[in-house]
Amino acid sequence: MASWSEFAADVPRLADGVRRLLQQYGPGLGYLATVRADGGPRVHPVSPVLAEEGLFCFVIDSPKRRDLERDGRYALHSFPAEESDDEAYLAGRAQLVTDPARVTRLARRHCAIYDIDWRLFEFSIDVAMIAQHDIAGVARPAVQVWLEPGDQAGSGQPGQPRRAGSAAPTVDQGSAAA
């Protein structure tokens, strides 16, 4: 599992494209999918926080918070863009941030309201994907996928962006994060 900063250092243009789509409306906006206790999916809109030190989310007392506390697996998808059908997707594990100084610093920096029962989670990244669609919506989207270097699920060289469905990885960062 890679932190946001490790992911961004490995593939900066892909990370910039993900950041652009998550923050296209100003603050971070996305759909967070978690795993319910019965194994089914749960999806909620959230405001992820992208900081140099990581990808975070302040989560209030809710079913999704209990999902993350019980089973940290998540998927995060960007809100639909107004000018295009471009999309970003991240998946990995969320972990509760327990360092009080770190929680306080991020809460102050990102204006978290203190009188609400929230917890701060950091999202590690196992998979990142960005898809760019042509304006007419006719051609297949240009898709790039990044797999965390320790992830054995991918073929070729994990950690390098590749087009989904290709047999060998291709380092083509320019098409998805331009």
Q: How would you describe each model-predicted region?
A:
Residues 1-13, 84-178:
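Charged, gly/pro-rich active-site loop segments
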Residues 2-30:
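Short, basic/aromatic recognition patches
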Residues 22-36, 74-77:
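A short, Trp-centered hydrophobic/proline-enriched beta-strand micro-motif
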Residues 48-83:
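A short mixed-secondary-structure module that forms the rim of ligand-binding clefts
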